[in-house]
Design a protein with these regions (language model features):
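Glycine-rich phosphate/diphosphate-binding loop of Rossmann-like nucleotide-binding domains
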Residues: 1-33
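Active-site rim loops that border cofactor/substrate pockets in soluble metabolic enzymes
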Residues: 20-56
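C-terminal binding/interaction regions
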Residues: 75-76, 80-147
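Glycine-rich phosphate-binding loop
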Residues: 41-86
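Short, well-ordered amphipathic alpha-helical segments that serve as non-catalytic structural scaffolds
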Residues: 7-16, 38-44, 85-86, 136
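Short, ordered loop/turn segments at secondary-structure junctions
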Residues: 1, 32, 66-67, 113-117
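Short beta-strand segments at enzyme active-site cores
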Residues: 29, 58-64, 105-113
């Protein structure tokens, strides 16, 4: 959803990570069909994502999305769901073994815009208020270095 905005946020995050020394081959981007599904995608990286037959663990996960308020309460439900999901991942970690729950912790950075209209989102995706994807990347670097 709102791909014009989320692509700008993601590119800002990627450019910032590379600028600060992260190798592009170490940046993995996953697309999910909607904002509510962001938490599931993040959980895969927290708990270890299989790639080329090997488990791959993230040093940090940046959850990027954009929810623009409409005429129904759906906005509130979506925003609450993704916020709560990210909070739970940060507080409780993810299971790195599905049979035996062993939590693994990894910072999950909330870079989801929740705006009243499209202009507010554009302003925060490289517009007059900067790029929240850039801020998410800086936060991810700082949090990964805490470990």
């Amino acid at each position: 959803w709102n791909s014009e905005i989320t692509h700008k946020l993601a590119q800002g995050a990627i450019d910032t990570l590379v600028k600060h020394g992260v190798k592009e081959e170490n940046i993995d981007v996953m697309h999910v069909p909607g904002t509510v599904e962001l938490t599931y995608g993040a959980a895969l990286y927290v708990s270890g994502k299989k790639k080329f037959g090997m488990l791959k663990y993230a040093d940090a996960v940046i959850v990027i999305g954009c929810v623009i308020q409409g005429d129904t309460p759906h906005f509130d439900y979506v925003c609450q769901s993704v916020t709560q999901g990210v909070t739970i991942l940060n507080a409780q970690g993810g299971a790195n073994d599905r049979a035996y729950y062993t939590p693994r912790y990894c910072p999950v950075i909330f870079s989801v815009l929740t705006t009243l209209d499209k202009q507010q989102a554009l302003d925060r995706a490289g517009g007059r208020l900067g790029n929240k994807g850039v801020e998410g990347a800086v936060t991810a670097i700082k949090m990964a270095n805490l470990l």
